[in-house]
């Protein structure tokens, strides 16, 4: 009888140890894959395995910005699958041949590609030197594929087809303001800011924002700090953080302003 009781206790203890080990492993896995909050700062352009930034915000549970250099004669293909991330691309240095869901496009610097989950896009470099693109990955805890598809299909926007509206500080190209799979609103415009001018006094707004400099040299107010931003760099701005940008160069600065909520 004592032997049976001893065996039972031993088996029970062994099972409890397995449960504890499994629980600890699962907890560590959750911590490993949890996305850290993206910090408000200027992130430098770079290519390779390391992303410019990789984390989460108030809306996106995952937001990653990567730089890709595509060598002459090479191509890159993207398809995250029906349940995968939503992707957004900007041509940093082109031109580059783009095939979106089987339709061909020839896109140069400043052009964009928006890719819904499950669709295909291929970037092909037909030049001898490298071309460069940004890739932004977006995921949400509450994705809505029907919402994204109802707003429209995956698309490209050619820089040379974008409408430019001049104003007293330079001008603006309003690309789109629409619903997407990962967010009820995704808004992008491109600002041209004349030399020596500021975009506006430092201000705040609830929406998070990315300022991505495709041509120029500026200084950004980000909360209590001032940080330099040059061609290729991107600033990620948290909700309600005072910010603005001043053009430090003797030529116009051109940058993307990307917001979502």
Model regions: which residues?
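Conserved short histidine dyad/triad with adjacent acidic residue
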Residues: 63-82, 189-204
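A short, N-terminal "cap"/entry segment at the start of jelly-roll beta-barrel domains
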Residues: 33-67, 71-78, 109, 128-131, ...
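Ligand-binding loop in jelly-roll beta-barrel domains
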Residues: 118-142, 239-261
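N-terminal signal peptide c-region/cleavage motif recognized by signal peptidases
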Residues: 29-31
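Histidine-centered metal-chelating micro-motifs
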Residues: 75-77, 81, 95, 112-113, ...
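Short acidic-glycine-tyrosine-enriched beta hairpin
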Residues: 102-117, 225-239
């Amino acid at each position: 009888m004592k032997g049976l009781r001893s065996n039972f206790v031993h088996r029970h203890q062994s099972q409890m140890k397995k449960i504890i080990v499994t629980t600890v492993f699962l907890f560590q896995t959750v911590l490993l894959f949890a996305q850290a909050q993206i910090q408000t700062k200027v992130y430098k352009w770079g290519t390779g395995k390391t992303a410019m930034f990789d984390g989460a915000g108030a809306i996106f549970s995952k937001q990653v910005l990567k730089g890709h250099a595509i060598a002459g004669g090479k191509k890159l293909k993207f398809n995250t699958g029906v349940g995968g991330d939503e992707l957004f691309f900007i041509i940093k240095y082109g031109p580059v041949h783009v095939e979106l869901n089987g339709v061909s496009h020839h896109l140069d610097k400043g052009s964009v590609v928006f890719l819904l989950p499950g669709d295909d896009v291929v970037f092909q470099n037909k030049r001898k030197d490298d071309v460069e693109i940004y890739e932004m990955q977006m995921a949400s805890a509450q994705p809505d594929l029907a919402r994204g598809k109802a707003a429209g299909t995956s698309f490209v926007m050619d820089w040379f087809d974008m409408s430019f509206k001049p104003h007293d500080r330079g001008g603006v190209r309003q690309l789109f303001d629409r619903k997407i799979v990962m967010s009820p609103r995704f808004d992008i415009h491109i600002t041209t800011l004349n030399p020596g001018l500021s975009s506006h006094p430092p201000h705040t707004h609830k929406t998070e924002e990315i300022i991505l400099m495709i041509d120029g040299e500026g200084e950004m107010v980000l909360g209590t700090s001032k940080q330099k931003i040059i061609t290729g760099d991107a600033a990620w701005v948290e909700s309600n953080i005072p910010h603005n940008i001043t053009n430090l160069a003797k030529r116009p600065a051109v940058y993307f302003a990307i917001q979502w909520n």
